[in-house]
Curated annotation (Swiss-Prot):
It catalyses: L-homoserine + ATP = O-phospho-L-homoserine + ADP + H(+). Transmembrane segments: none annotated. Catalyzes the ATP-dependent phosphorylation of L-homoserine to L-homoserine phosphate. ATP binds at P84, L85, S86, R87, G88, L89, G90, S91, S92, S93, A94. PROSITE patterns: GHMP_KINASES_ATP. Signal peptide: none annotated. Belongs to the GHMP kinase family. Homoserine kinase subfamily. One of its GO terms (molecular function) is ATP binding. Its main location: cytoplasm. The lineage of its organism: Bacteria, Pseudomonadati, Campylobacterota, Epsilonproteobacteria, Nautiliales. This is Homoserine kinase. The keyword Transcription regulation does not apply. It holds the Pfam family GHMP_kinases_N. GO terms for cellular component: cytoplasm.
Amino acid sequence: MIISVPATSANLGPGFDTLGLALDLRNIVKIKKSRFFSISIKGEGANNVRLKGNNLFISIFNEHYRKLVGKTDKFRFTFINKIPLSRGLGSSSAVIVSAIAAAYAMAGVAIPREKLLNLALIYEPHPDNITPAVMGGFNVAVVENNKVYSLKKEIPQSLKAVVVIPNRPISTAHSRTRLPKRFAMSDVVYNVSRSSLLTAAFFSENWEMLRVASMDKLHQDIRMRGLPELFELQKLALQKGALMSTLSGSGSTFFNLCYESKAKELAKVLKDRFAKYQVKILDFDNKGLIIEE
């Protein structure tokens, strides 16, 4: 059984805990029944001993598999990780979604995507990452009475993502503690209006509108102060062809959306200026979770 889940970029500027999209950078898990339990990790996290001893995927997988079949069995797990850890690209959501999907698949029980999404909400209470991880594409998602309500829009191949990945991780939990408990009404209105406009821009494919619609006054500046060069990065990206330039999740990755014709030029400019950072040109992913026999 092979399970794969895409990377995600959430918040997208003003859409705090609400907006997210999927990127064509996947974590893959291969699972086989075995006489012995074993874990093999390739790619991101391969040298992290803690991931083998205290593995979130295994914990969630065993919890759901046991509920479905009434016992635990031994499996050989091979993880091929392409999503950087703790960089704001949804690595935790990918683990959660793939673990639940894998448990149901190995138990031989079909699970609708909507149900899987709501089970994932138990471990990740903010739907902006888990929703595109499951559904693919651009998603607007809210939680009401512990249930996710979401709408998806596929993203055309004429657009590309240029992501800039610093060599420094940022903890989402720690990042949240830096945010204020209260916000000015004018700033809240600013964000509500722009997140609404950004959603409309995606669904109507009015990409030029994103330059205005992706602005934020609630969280990005506070989070970016921990890595001040991100302010320069954002300004440079918007000058050199990005339609929007936003902190990806809580960071440290910066997400830039542009037309395909601008992607290589934008990536080169950013790589030349921020030589110590990884710069990747990525397609958008419209499939989300994939399960293969």
